[in-house]
């Protein structure tokens, strides 16, 4: 697979304007990235501009805290798909996981997988807030709930992707799931290290620099 197809070209800053999003979309077309990842209010715009290409539209759910209710996340997912999203990056309820409420976390992922139908679901576990044991548990619950990917980070918390976390996540989910490294990846060398450790998707706001 060529390097560009690893990349979710991402712009999730709250102050991003329509002009910024359109620039992101054009870059994704030019460099043939896997997707653009945008906030839900920009999904329709992205869909309209990418529907005749093979660049997917990715959006976020329960972002960035993961602390909204399951019902809210399910509704967000359904609306995003109606608006044209191909991929859903959802944030788990980190506090529920850390409280040992495994069934809650598994249920919310399962409900979003069900709501997404045939669309791709990536589960953001926010590795920087978890212990090693919690990282393994989050990955295991994601797999049991039927998600397609596990993802390291929102990029809005205390840290981003680390190679050792990618390795642990890959070892936990096996070969059947995707692993997305996101947050703090700024160079091609950093991206290649993530891929070597098991990442099959890279979330980055500097996608153009990574493939130039």
From Swiss-Prot:
EC number: 4.1.2.4
Active site location: 89, 151, 180
Record organism: Clostridium botulinum (strain 657 / Type Ba4)
One Gene Ontology CC term in the entry: cytoplasm
Pathway membership, UniProt: Carbohydrate degradation; 2-deoxy-D-ribose 1-phosphate degradation; D-glyceraldehyde 3-phosphate and acetaldehyde from 2-deoxy-alpha-D-ribose 1-phosphate: step 2/2
Protein name (Swiss-Prot/TrEMBL): Deoxyribose-phosphate aldolase
Subcellular location(s) per record: Cytoplasm
Reaction(s) this enzyme catalyzes, per UniProt: 2-deoxy-D-ribose 5-phosphate = D-glyceraldehyde 3-phosphate + acetaldehyde
Pfam families found in the cross-reference section: DeoC
Keyword Manganese: no
Predominant location: cytoplasm
Molecular-function annotations in GO: deoxyribose-phosphate aldolase activity
UniProt keywords, alphabetically: Cytoplasm, Lyase, Schiff base
GO biological process assignments: 2-deoxyribose 1-phosphate catabolic process; carbohydrate catabolic process; deoxyribonucleotide catabolic process
Similarity comment: family membership: Belongs to the DeoC/FbaB aldolase family. DeoC type 1 subfamily.
Keyword Cytoplasm: yes
Role this protein plays: Catalyzes a reversible aldol reaction between acetaldehyde and D-glyceraldehyde 3-phosphate to generate 2-deoxy-D-ribose 5-phosphate.
């Amino acid at each position: 697979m060529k390097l560009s197809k690893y990349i979710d070209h991402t712009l999730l800053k709250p102050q991003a304007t329509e002009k910024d999003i359109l620039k992101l979309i054009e870059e994704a077309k030019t460099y043939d990235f896997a997707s653009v990842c945008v906030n839900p209010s920009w999904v329709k715009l992205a869909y309209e501009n990418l529907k005749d290409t093979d660049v997917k539209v990715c959006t976020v759910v329960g972002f960035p805290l993961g602390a909204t209710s399951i019902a809210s996340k399910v509704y967000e997912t359904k609306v995003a798909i109606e608006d044209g999203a191909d991929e859903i990056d959802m944030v788990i309820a980190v506090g529920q996981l850390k409280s040992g409420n495994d069934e809650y976390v598994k249920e919310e992922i399962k409900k979003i997988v069900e709501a997404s139908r045939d669309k791709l679901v990536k589960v953001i576990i926010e590795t920087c807030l978890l212990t090693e044991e919690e990282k393994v548990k989050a990955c295991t619950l994601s797999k049991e709930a039927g998600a397609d990917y596990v993802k390291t980070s929102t990029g809005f918390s205390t840290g981003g992707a680390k190679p050792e976390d990618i390795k642990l996540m890959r070892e936990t989910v096996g070969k059947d799931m995707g692993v997305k490294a996101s947050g703090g990846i700024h160079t091609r060398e950093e991206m290649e290290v993530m891929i070597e450790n098991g990442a099959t998707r890279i979330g980055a706001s500097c996608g153009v620099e990574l493939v130039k």
